[in-house]
Amino acid sequence: MHAACSCFDNGNSGMSRFVNLELGGESEEQRPQKKTLVKDEAYYHAEARSAFENGSFELALRLYSKVLEFNPNSAEAWTGQVRMLIEVGHHEEARLWADKALERIPRDAELLAAKAVALGRCGDLQGALAFSDSAIEERGDSPYVWLARADVLLARKESRADYCLEKALTLAPQDWFVAWLGARIRYYYKQFVVALKLLQQAVELNATHFLLWLELGRCQQTLGLAGPARHSFEQARQLNPNCRDAGLELTRLSGMGAGPRLRGWWRRLFNR
């Protein structure tokens, strides 16, 4: 262990040797410099994934673009961009971007799955099913491929979507990320009660992630569960004091009257 001491070298060679000994035999000049951060493909890919996991979809979109600057054939980056466009609601743009990506990488399962979701949300339900079929044929062990299948089937109003979501969760049983993505799909299709259960599952797997508490609170608020929603927003703010959305949601919740709570009761009743 290196000693922590404050010494001044006044030209005394003995003192210099003493400092060298205390520092493990190396002077300041001899010690290796701190490594410079290399911003390469791996760096931007990790940053993009982190942004995705924190719900910063537009930032993730830009970061996946940086990955493609280093590697124009990165299937993960192309798929990531398509998925981020879907998350921010730009479904037609996501479809066009998926077409461009598939010109380079025509048989990537998750890219095919993302294209299927984009088509489904654009209303091309037959095309969505065809691309989802192709994705499963390419790689049936990917949780995202099954999440995408569920998305497509929900767009088609088919009950088989339940099986597909369960399949995704079975393939990644301890992965909060997959449970969270499943919840976002359910929420998009206004299946709030089932979304709530998936968010609760995600929180159990990763209780220290502010975003899960934030989205849990939003789902609870939508269902008229004011007390639990307040608790969830407070947890989100405690875990991330810089989360402005948590504060805004708490303010909005304070202004909720009986009307929204009653509407929430009806939602719960008819979502069973």
Outline where the language-model segments fall.
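Helix-start (N-cap) detector for alpha-helical repeat units in TPR-like alpha-solenoids
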Residues: 41, 75-76, 109-110, 142-144, ...
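Alpha-helical adaptor scaffolds
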Residues: 117, 144-204, 211
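Structural signature of tandem alpha-helical TPR/SEL1-like repeats
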Residues: 54-62, 88-100, 122-134, 153-167, ...
